[in-house]
Regions:
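Conserved catalytic palm subdomain of right-hand nucleotidyl-transferase polymerases, strongest
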Residues: 105-107, 179-186, 235-244, 285-320
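Conserved pre-motif C helix in the palm subdomain of viral-like polymerases
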Residues: 12, 19, 237-268, 282-292, ...
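Residues immediately flanking
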Residues: 84, 175, 183, 228-230, ...
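Intrinsically disordered, low-complexity regulatory regions enriched in Ser/Pro/Gly/Thr
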Residues: 56, 72-73, 216-219, 235-237, ...
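Active-site palm subdomain of RNA-directed nucleic acid polymerases
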Residues: 26, 259-272, 296-300, 305
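Arg/Lys-enriched, amphipathic patches
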Residues: 1-115, 129, 157-161, 174
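Surface-exposed loop/turn segments and immediately adjacent short secondary-structure elements
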Residues: 75-237, 243, 251
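Amphipathic alpha-helical interface elements that mediate macromolecular binding in regulatory proteins
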Residues: 2, 6-9, 13, 24, ...
Length: 320
């Protein structure tokens, strides 16, 4: 695992240098090539050769394609605009996202507006530190006594058996190619494109983690980005934290998810309609509506009913 992590860091450094040479100045290269094309066309119109015009046009098309792909990756959109050139669309998407995600200020716990950069970061740090820190609960054994055992011996045997190279290959192929990268700076597309070359080393590292239960600390490093839930967010709770993980970490978690997937319908209660295949979160909305309708229209008998609505904020962030 350490050897692969070191290779990724070295590759990232080399790719940054390569990107600067080939993409960093692409706008200037396009402007310069357009100027050369204009001069070549002018010379050809005066009786010169048309050969340079064709050559420069090909070079310009390559540069324009680079620019389009660069902005498409930055936009990270799944929708492909129709037409020959999508650069302006992708540039607009990327710029709009950057502008929308910029945090100009936030209200603190007292409701006072804070706009200083250090104060804003401190407010978010304090909130999420409190959210993700355990509260030292007691008597967990008594709680677990009331949880019915649903994983039978055959299921457990399948879940704990050693992971294989095939499971790692399936996991990397299932990942969206241009998802935002984590601290490693690599999108899944890099691994997918060069899997034939880097696959054996990466698979060995992933399997060492899955089958030993140990993970290198640097692989677990994660960027947290805050996405606004509303158009003009004013409080910390109006932002949704998104974790940008290293690709190796994503492969590990994807392989585990694939292993669990066939058993989820048997493990997860039928009352839970989200996060499992062939179930819709809208089903529970219909059940709630029908239940309330029955309670409202029920007129026979003396037995009454009561509905209790619980709003558990951040219910999936911590289990204790």
């Amino acid at each position: 695992m350490f050897r692969v992590s070191k290779k990724i860091k070295k590759c990232k450094k080399m790719l940054k240098s390569w990107s600067k040479d080939h993409f960093g100045s692409v706008k200037r290269q396009i402007a310069k090539t357009k100027e050369l094309l204009w001069k070549a066309e002018e010379d050809a119109a005066k009786g010169g050769s048309y050969g340079p015009v064709s050559q420069i046009r090909r070079e310009l098309n390559v540069l324009l394609d680079k620019e389009s792909r660069m902005w498409k990756q930055r936009a990270r959109t799944q929708w492909v605009a129709k037409g020959d050139k999508n650069t302006s669309y992708f540039h607009g998407v990327a710029t709009q996202r950057k502008r929308r995600n910029f945090i100009k200020g936030i209200k603190d716990e007292e409701g006072v507006w804070q706009s200083a950069k250090g104060t804003i970061s401190g407010i978010f740090m304090e909130y999420y530190t409190r959210l993700f820190t355990q509260s030292n609960p007691h008597e967990l054994d008594r709680v677990l006594e009331g949880v019915q055992q649903v994983v039978i011996a055959d299921m457990n045997a399948e879940l704990v058996k050693p992971y294989t190279m095939e499971e790692v290959d399936i996991a990397i192929k299932q990942m969206a190619p241009l998802k935002a990268p984590g601290p490693d700076g690599m999108p899944p597309l890099f691994y997918q494109s060069f899997w034939e070359k880097i696959g054996p080393d990466v698979s060995e590292a992933v399997l060492s983690c899955l089958n030993s239960g140990t993970l290198l600390k640097s692989i677990n490093h994660t960027f947290i980005t805050l996405i606004p839930k509303v158009n003009n967010p004013e409080t910390v709770m109006e932002f949704r934290p998104i974790s940008l993980c290293n690709v190796i970490y994503k492969i590990i978690s994807k392989a585990i998810a694939n292993r669990l997937k066939p058993f989820l319908n048997s493990i997860v209660s039928e009352a839970q309609s989200a996060f499992t295949a062939d179930r819709l979160i809208a089903d529970n909305i219909l059940i709630a509506f029908e239940s309330l309708h029955y309670m409202k229209t029920q007129i026979l008998g003396r037995e009454g009913f009561m509905a209790l609505k619980l709003d558990m904020s951040k219910a999936y962030n911590r289990v204790e």
